[in-house]
Every structure is written in C-alpha cells, then in structure tokens.
C-alpha cells in the first residue's frame, strides 16, 4: 500500500510509525528527461543511525535520485518507501513534513533575514495576540543550537555569515522539522579543513541520535572518514553497496568508472618547443611581485602554492583581468601589453577560471550560447554577420570531441553535471584555437572519471604544441601532469622544479617558506 504524504505525516505525528530496518528505500526507480535516461531501475536503502555515502561520476544519477527522495522530482517508475511504507512525495514540503530534509550544494537561505527567522520561516511561534513571538523564537533557536553544538547568534542576519555557518543554519533548520532523514549534497565543497572537522562532529552527533544521513561526495577521503557504507552509481544505474571499511580507494574507482584506472595522470613525453610566453618581474601592487617564468610550446607548467599565495591573481593579470603594475609579458619574444581579456584572446591566450559557476558558465544559457561566446566577434563573422550554421557545426563537433553528456546543444548549462559544465568551458576556449592555455583548478569539484578525461585532453593539447599553465591545489595532479612546477608563497615565486626532481615534500617546503 502507498500512503499519501498527508496520511504518512499524520501517522508519524501520532507516533505509530511502522517499524523497519530501513528508514528510506527506493526500488526499481526510473527517471527520464528529454533525450536522457537519468535513472534506470535504481535501488537504494538507508538504515537508521548511519551515514550512507553516494559515489559516482558527474551525471551518474546521484543528485536525480536524491531529488526524487526529497520530493523535488517524481519517478516515472518504481517505488519509494519511508519507514517501510510506500509513499508518494509531491513536493519538498511533503518530504519535510514526513521527516526528509535535503541540504543542497547551493544553500537556500534568505540573506536579509535573521538566523532564527530562516529556521522557523512559516512556522514562527505566535503570542496570544497572533503576532510573531520573537523572544520565544530566540529561545527555540538557542535550544536547537545547544542540541547541535552550534555557536551562532540567532539574531544575526544570514548575509553576514560564512558559507560554513550558513550550512550550520541549514542543518539546524532541517533538524527543527524533527527530520530523521537528512540528505547532504557536497556539503564540504566550500569549507576549510577546520570547518569540515566541525561539520563531521555534528554529523556524528546526528547519527548517534538515530538520524539517517545520505552524503553525496566526490571526495574519497571523506567517504572513509565519515561514511558507514556507500552506494555507487554509474550512467544512471545502481552498481552496488558496500561497507566503507571493506574496500580500497582503487575498488571504488573501478566501480565508479567501470574500468581500471591505472594511470590517472596520462602525462606523455612530448617534444618541448621554443619559448611561447615569457614573464619578467610581473608585479601587481599589494598582491604579488617580481614573478618571472617562461613556458614553451608543448610544455605543461604546473603552479602550486597555498591559499593566498597569489597563483590565481597572476593568471588573471596574464589574461588582462587585472592589469599589472609593472613587469613585462612577451609572446614569441615580442613584448606585448595585455590590459583586457579581448587583447589576451587576440594573442591566442585562453583562461579557464577557478570558479566555473561565478566567473565561467552562464548557467541560464544553453550549451551553444556558452560555447560560442569567445569566438563570435571574429572567427565566424563574415561581412559583418555571424554564420550561425558554422557556429553550430563547430560547437557540435567540439561537444562530441569532449564527450559532453547532453541530448542536444539547447540544454541549459545549469542542468549539466559539474564535469560536463567544465567541458563546455574548455570547449569554449578550444574554439579560439589557443597557443597559450591557462587552467585554474581545472578538475575542482568533478569526479574521478571526468578528471581523467580532462587530464587526457590537456596532454593532447600539449602534444599539439599548446603552452599550458595549470594551477592546482591537488598535489598528485601537479606532480603527475607537469613538466615543471612553479611554487608561490605570499605573492612571490619561491622556486621552479623540474619534473624529475619534484616531490611532494619539496613542493610543500617551497609553498610554506
């Protein structure tokens, strides 16, 4: 029997909740979107008092399944059971009232409302005159925070909080509904190491209270640290569920990608040509100074350094986003002035920014519109008019080459997985036929399979003579992909290491100097 959300909520409120080993299950679930099967005969089982991680490449179906379980989507086939009874969730509010809360990667709070107002919105306590009882709301919030060991002022406006503290408010809001199922989508993507540790303390405490937590992540170390068990999805299919302490990292990778990955960093020895880009004493007052390096055709120059070292600032200056205070930039031995992105593009330079959502993709536009932005002013203009046919053909070919998973180029970029969004951005710049490619954190926030694809693409570009500058915070990536590694600390270059001599210890010594 399948219960309506209202009936299920009433049963839950009465305390007569059906007993089951599992809090939440999905059986035979299928979900299609135009041209794409997002989920195909998927199953999932969440036990009480456990953290269950979901793993899989971008586009594997993890988020789609969670949106079904949270009432955002409705399955085309299959059944969802809550505490052993079938249920049809028609909306996120239905899910909340039945004890299922989802904390999205993009946090959903009202910035100009207080912490307390955000938590109790539409459920504010009222005084005997029917007005909001702010004093009682503060007390309720303080009691909730005490339970969760959260140290925040209930009266502060959310816009003044860090991302980590906003996440704490979201968790508190979910728990305030007496939720016993909590779904967390990439909760640590914008957190520092200390903030992650605090979040894990709260998750462990919630687990000890019998709450079941679904934890979507790309980070393998988090799975082993916080998850009791995990399920893997691939291409919209359920692959399997295992205890976290019974598998290795390589086991999980094999399950995720469906093949052995013996070489995550397919660096090849390619002929290194002449110097393409030469930077001398480049300075941006107050940010970095006297930065000097060369990059040759076919070379991958890795750039390493801790947060605040100035790596991204150097990239932005090279591309003309923030013009230098002093120093010189030369291309093919000829000094050039690059004080705008347009000038950089004219010199056949391309720049994949660190944050694909804020400074890269135009999320509300489709793939075609995103890909063509950098080339409309020149490459496909004839007699003052844009050749739409040629633009579309070039973008379709690039999409196939990069293996962007999409039914067509009219798909909005916001609907793509992180890895496919990154491919769209790379495709945008490859259409300009660059000679110098600057990549700032090219694989951040994407899954292991998509990372391997991007690494192969970068290697292919180097083989074709492109000079590549690759900024990365992932040490294995820097060591595995670079011909040389430039290390920065507090706005200065502290050393440049050849591939043969570079080790993690040497890089960290230079980065912390």
UniProtKB/Swiss-Prot annotation:
The cross-references to PROSITE patterns, in alphabetical order and at most eight, read:
ABC_TRANSPORTER_1, ABC_TRANSPORTER_2, MGLA, RBSA
| UniProt domain ABC transporter: residue ranges | 24-260, 270-510
InterPro entries xrefs: AAA+_ATPase (IPR003593), ABC_carbohydrate_import_ATPase (IPR050107), ABC_transporter-like_ATP-bd (IPR003439), ABC_transporter-like_CS (IPR017871), P-loop_NTPase (IPR027417)
Q: Which reaction does it catalyse?
A: D-ribose(out) + ATP + H2O = D-ribose(in) + ADP + phosphate + H(+); D-galactose(out) + ATP + H2O = D-galactose(in) + ADP + phosphate + H(+)
Per its UniProt record, what Gene3D superfamilies does this chain match?
Answer: P-loop containing nucleotide triphosphate hydrolases (3.40.50.300)
- Disulfide cross-links: none
EC numbers? 7.5.2.11, 7.5.2.7
The compartments listed are:
Cell inner membrane
> How would you describe this protein's topology in the membrane?
Peripheral membrane protein
Membrane as a keyword?
yes
Query: Does Mitochondrion show up as a keyword for this record?
Result: no
Q: Which residues form the signal peptide?
A: none
Q: What is its main location?
A: membrane
Keyword vocabulary terms for this entry? ATP-binding, Cell inner membrane, Cell membrane, Membrane, Nucleotide-binding, Plasmid, Repeat, Sugar transport, Translocase, Transport
Q: Name one Pfam family in it.
A: ABC_tran
Gene Ontology terms, cellular component aspect?
plasma membrane
Query: MF terms per GO, please?
Result: ABC-type D-ribose transporter activity; ATP binding; ATP hydrolysis activity
Write out the residues that bind ATP. Answer: 56-63
Q: What does this protein do?
A: Part of an ABC transporter complex involved in carbohydrate import. Could be involved in ribose, galactose and/or methyl galactoside import. Responsible for energy coupling to the transport system.
Family per similarity comment = Belongs to the ABC transporter superfamily. Carbohydrate importer 2 (CUT2) (TC 3.A.1.2) family.
Protein name as annotated: Putative ribose/galactose/methyl galactoside import ATP-binding protein 2
Organism in which the protein naturally occurs:
Rhizobium meliloti (strain 1021)
């Amino acid at each position: 029997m399948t219960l309506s959300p209202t009936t299920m909520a009433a049963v839950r409120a009465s305390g007569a909740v059906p007993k089951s080993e599992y809090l939440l299950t999905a059986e035979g679930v299928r979900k299609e979107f135009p041209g794409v099967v997002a989920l195909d005969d998927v199953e999932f089982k969440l036990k009480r008092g456990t953290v269950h991680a979901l793993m899989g490449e971008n586009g594997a179906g993890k988020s789609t399944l969670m949106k079904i379980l949270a009432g955002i989507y409705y399955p085309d086939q299959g059944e969802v059971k809550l505490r052993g009874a079938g249920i049809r969730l028609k909306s996120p509010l239905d899910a909340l009232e039945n004890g299922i809360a989802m904390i999205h990667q993009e946090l959903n709070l009202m910035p100009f409302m207080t912490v307390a107002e955000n938590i109790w919105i539409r459920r504010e306590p009222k005084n005997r005159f029917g007005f909001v009882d702010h004093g009682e709301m503060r007390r309720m919030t303080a009691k909730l925070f005490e339970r969760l060991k959260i140290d925040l002022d209930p009266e502060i406006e959310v816009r003044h909080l860090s991302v980590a503290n906003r996440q704490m408010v979201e968790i508190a809001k979910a728990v305030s509904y007496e939720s016993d199922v909590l779904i967390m989508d990439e909760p640590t993507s914008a957190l520092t190491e200390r903030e992650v540790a605090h979040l894990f303390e709260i998750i462990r405490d919630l687990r000890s209270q019998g709450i079941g937590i679904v934890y979507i992540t790309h980070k393998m170390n988090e799975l082993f640290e916080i998850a009791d068990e995990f399920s893997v999805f691939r291409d919209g299919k359920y692959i399997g569920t295992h205890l976290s302490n019974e598998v290795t990292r390589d086991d999980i990778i094999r399950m995720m990608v469906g093949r052995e990955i013996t070489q995550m960093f397919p660096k090849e020895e390619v002929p290194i040509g002449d110097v393409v880009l030469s930077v001398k004493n480049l300075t941006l007052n107050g940010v970095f100074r006297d930065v000097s390096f060369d990059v040759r055709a076919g070379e991958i120059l890795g750039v390493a350094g801790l947060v605040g070292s100035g790596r991204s600032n150097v990239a932005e200056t090279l591309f003309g986003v923030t013009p230098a205070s002093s120093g010189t930039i030369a291309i093919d031995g000829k000094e050039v002035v690059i004080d705008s992105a347009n000038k950089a593009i004219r010199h056949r330079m391309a720049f994949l920014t660190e944050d694909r959502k804020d400074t890269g993709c135009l999320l509300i536009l489709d793939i075609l519109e995103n890909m063509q932005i950098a080339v409309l002013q020149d490459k496909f203009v004839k007699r003052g008019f844009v050749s739409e046919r040629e633009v579309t053909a070039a973008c379709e070919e690039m999409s196939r080459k990069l293996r962007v998973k999409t039914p067509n180029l009219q798909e909005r970029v916001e609907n793509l997985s992180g890895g496919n969004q990154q491919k769209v951005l790379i495709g945008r710049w490859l259409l300009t036929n660059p000679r110098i490619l600057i990549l700032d954190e090219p694989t951040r926030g994407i899954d292991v399979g998509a990372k391997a694809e991007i690494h192969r693409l970068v290697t292919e570009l180097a083989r074709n003579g492109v000079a590549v500058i690759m900024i990365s915070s992932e040490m294995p990536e820097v060591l595995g992909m670079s011909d040389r590694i430039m290390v920065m600390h507090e706005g200065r270059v502290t050393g440049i290491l050849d591939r043969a001599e570079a080790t993690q210890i040497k890089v960290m010594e230079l980065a912390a100097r």
